[in-house]
Amino acid sequence: MAGKTFFIDTTKCTACRGCQIACKQWNMNPATKTTQKGSHQNPEDLSFSTFKLVRFSELEENEKPVWYFFADQCRHCLEPPCMYTAQSLGVKAIIRDEATGAVLYDPKVKVKAADAKTIRESCPWNIPRWDQKTTGMAKCTMCIDRVKEGLLPACVKTCPTGTMNFGERAKMLEMANKRLQEVKAKYPKAQLLNAEIVRTIYLVIDDPQKYHKFASAEDAEEITSIAAIKKLIRPLANLSQFLG
């Protein structure tokens, strides 16, 4: 399948949060007011105005502190459950750009709270966010405006360590698999997360749960099936609305 893909190599991440700041800056999103929660992670979670978040998982192993860094963002699924769920609900807020594969939200489309909750719950990675004030939904846009002009997404452009990579899907898959083999020599548990169903591929060296609760979708086949079912029932939902 063609289109664009991110490859995020967590083994190179220093949690500088340059990607997080660049995302805010390019999208002109405001800073999120936060309070100290006893962690270096800031803000606490993704939001309507925070599309990219470097998560800090601070654990103890063999009586030594261990940090796992995870630059969280939308996975831009090949078969996006959020989009098919929205369509089955009659919500016209989510589309997919066929050239890049980017899953795009229109934050100006008003979405009912109940529908937004259903859409968010359909996402295995807990990404979609709803704004109570505007009643719109938002998330990572793959910097579609930059990509269409031949530029890298802001987060990739600013990354100083090579953690963030972006390009044609075939090239990114090749890069990811090559890097996986290199890393496995030292970290046998290393794996690529859900590479067969997403356009944001993570390389991790340990149990994904140590990085983040929603780092990996447990049953990729089931997710793909659910998306396919929603795709099939969408015409029926549209017909039902047409008939009143």
Q: Where do the PLM segments sit?
A:
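Non-ligating segments of multi-cofactor redox enzymes
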Residues: 1-244
